[in-house]
């Protein structure tokens, strides 16, 4: 009887899972205990920075600029999938677009001053660093869930998923350098390395950039008899894309390159030099692992939860609550501390819709996102 009670509780929990985690990761353990056929579709988008309004990222940054010491982060994610489920199996066609930009305070300050056409006190030193990585891909993913028994008070669900991906676009960039403000501008010395699948250069060998790869997802859920559960998900574990025929360039800018004229006098000129690879490159991209852990505890008609996401060394803590209106409907409310977004959601046994933003005025929001899921069982 106790075993049946835990299994029933697990199936009720999974039938209307709320994706409160900021990264909205896939958890293959959701499929454990499922029965029958079904179809589903989902779409998710997140635009987030922690130093400027997301919609103004390509603008002049204006009043929304609020940098901080250390790494200033910008993330763009869009995912869509549609597929079928059968018992504890799930097969889906997927689309992924993911970008991450990490820059230090000196670089974003330097960009801001130039966007705003602001003068800077002479002698100010900027040590700039930038890392950027992004890709787009489509493919297929197969998930499988497994049910295990821990003891009389708890069940364990496990899951694994494998994706086969075809890349459609990629870009990888690193930049570093130093700039010193002067009365008339800047003295600078900087280097950029950039591989962009959409770039074209003179004399480059013919070829069309293309990518292929795979991704491994793992998940686990522990469900206790009193209704509490711990959810763990790791996406893109031991995963990679191989990009063929990638253009590549390295550029160096120096404001004080030594030159001697015909009379032998020394003077300094600003120069911009670069080397474009004639032969296209093969680049192996290790997809960054993404993880999420969340603990839910029931309290009457409410569930209280706390958790955190993780990616590339960055943490995304969240706190929230879920209110059970009745057996078919739930609402959710959560807050993330990294981008300071408030998330609200509504959950039905057949669909989920949630949105988040760091401001009621989307144009001023440093982060905003939307998630929609529909699951229809064939009864």
Locations of regions flagged by a protein language model:
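Sec-dependent N-terminal signal peptides
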Residues: 4-14
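Sec/Tat signal peptide C-region and signal peptidase I cleavage site
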Residues: 14-20
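A subset of solvent-exposed loop/turn segments in beta-rich extracellular surface proteins, enriched
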Residues: 21-206, 251-269, 353-356, 361-378
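Transmembrane beta-barrel architecture of outer-membrane proteins
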Residues: 76-78, 95, 136-140, 164-166, ...
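Structural signature of outer-membrane beta-barrel channels/translocons
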Residues: 83-89, 94-96, 145-151, 221-225, ...
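Membrane-embedded hairpin module used as a gating/binding unit in multi-pass transport
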Residues: 215-223, 230-243
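Outer membrane beta-barrel transmembrane domains
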Residues: 244-379
């Amino acid at each position: 009887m106790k075993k049946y009670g835990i299994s029933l509780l697990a199936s009720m929990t999974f039938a209307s899972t709320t994706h409160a985690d900021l990264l909205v990761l896939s958890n293959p353990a959701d499929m454990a205990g499922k029965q029958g056929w079904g179809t589903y579709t989902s779409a998710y988008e997140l635009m987030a920075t922690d130093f400027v309004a997301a919609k103004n990222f390509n603008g002049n940054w204006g009043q929304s600029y609020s940098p901080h010491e250390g790494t200033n982060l910008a993330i763009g994610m869009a995912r869509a999938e549609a597929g079928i489920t059968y018992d504890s199996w799930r097969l889906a066609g997927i689309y992924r677009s993911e970008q991450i930009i990490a820059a230090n305070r000196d670089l974003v300050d330097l960009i801001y001053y130039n966007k705003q056409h602001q003068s800077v006190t002479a002698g100010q030193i900027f040590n700039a660093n930038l890392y950027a990585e992004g890709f787009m891909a489509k493919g297929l993913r197969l998930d499988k869930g497994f049910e295990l028994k821990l003891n009389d008070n708890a069940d364990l669900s496990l899951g694994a998923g494998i994706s086969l991906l075809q890349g459609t676009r990629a870009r990888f960039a690193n930049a570093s350098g130093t700039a010193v403000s002067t009365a008339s501008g800047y003295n600078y010395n900087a280097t950029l390395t950039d591989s962009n699948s959409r770039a074209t250069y003179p004399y480059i060998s013919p070829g069309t950039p293309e990518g292929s790869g795979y991704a491994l997802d793992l998940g686990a859920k522990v469900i206790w008899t009193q209704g509490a559960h711990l959810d763990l998900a790791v996406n893109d574990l031991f995963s990679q894309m191989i990009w063929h025929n990638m253009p590549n360039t390295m550029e160096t800018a120096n404001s004080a390159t030594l030159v001697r004229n015909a009379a032998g006098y020394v003077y300094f000129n600003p120069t911009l030099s670069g080397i474009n690879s004639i032969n296209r490159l093969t680049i192996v991209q290790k997809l960054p692992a993404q993880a999420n852990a969340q603990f839910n505890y029931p309290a009457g008609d409410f569930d209280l939860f706390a958790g955190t996401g993780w990616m590339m060394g960055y943490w995304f803590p969240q706190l929230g609550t879920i209110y059970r209106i009745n057996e078919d409907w739930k609402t959710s409310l959560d807050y993330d501390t990294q981008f300071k977004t408030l998330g609200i959601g509504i959950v039905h046994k057949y669909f989920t819709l949630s949105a988040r933003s760091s401001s009621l005025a989307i144009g001023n929001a440093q982060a905003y996102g939307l998630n929609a899921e529909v699951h229809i069982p064939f009864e």
